[in-house]
């Protein structure tokens, strides 16, 4: 990773329940060079619509990267030809190359996975009462991680 905003990494942290029983799926997006967390949005599901909305907002705020590196889970990849999903086709149309790590090799996105470990420890133990309150925790974490270097 040779320059800011060239390669972004993205992943869902994995679902968990808030104290009211609602599932939360944190979508995280990181600049691969600077390790700046561009976004962490708690979604109600890992749907195309929600994921595309988050990326659209990030593109508007930070511009378009050249590459987005993800794992092989939905909505990033499918079992179709070349594993292209509707999301990755959208990225291609925007001029972004979707780069998939090898299946079952999360270490190929190791920096991102390490950030996830810290995110989980700092924001979900215990989980917040609601998804809205959980998002506030994610927002505080982003501020501390990006601006205060506390992790």
Give the positions of each predicted feature:
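Mobile-element integrase/transposase regions
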Residues: 1-30, 36, 44, 48-57, ...
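Short, small-residue-enriched loops and turns at beta-alpha junctions
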Residues: 16, 76-77, 108
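Charged alpha-helix within mobile-element recombinases
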Residues: 87-151
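Acidic/histidine-rich, metal-coordinating catalytic segments
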Residues: 58-80, 102-104
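Mobile genetic element proteins and their domesticated derivatives, centered on retroelements
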Residues: 11, 29, 35, 55, ...
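Active-site-proximal flexible loops/turns
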Residues: 18, 38, 78-79, 116
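Charged helix-capping and loop-helix junction motifs
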Residues: 81-86
């Amino acid at each position: 990773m040779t320059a800011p905003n060239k390669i972004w990494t993205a992943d869902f942290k994995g679902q968990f329940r808030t104290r009211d029983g609602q599932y939360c799926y944190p979508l995280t997006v990181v600049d691969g060079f600077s390790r700046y967390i561009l976004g962490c949005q708690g979604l109600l599901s890992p749907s195309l619509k929600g994921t595309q909305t988050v990326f659209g907002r990030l593109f508007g705020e930070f511009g378009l990267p050249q590459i987005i590196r993800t794992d092989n889970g939905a909505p990033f990849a499918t079992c179709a030809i070349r594993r292209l999903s509707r999301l990755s086709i959208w990225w291609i149309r925007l001029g972004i190359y979707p780069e998939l790590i090898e299946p079952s090799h999360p270490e190929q996105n190791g920096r991102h996975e390490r950030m996830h470990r810290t995110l989980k420890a700092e924001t979900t133990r215990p989980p917040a009462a609601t998804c809205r309150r959980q998002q506030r925790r994610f927002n505080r974490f982003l501020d501390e991680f990006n601006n205060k270097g506390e992790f």
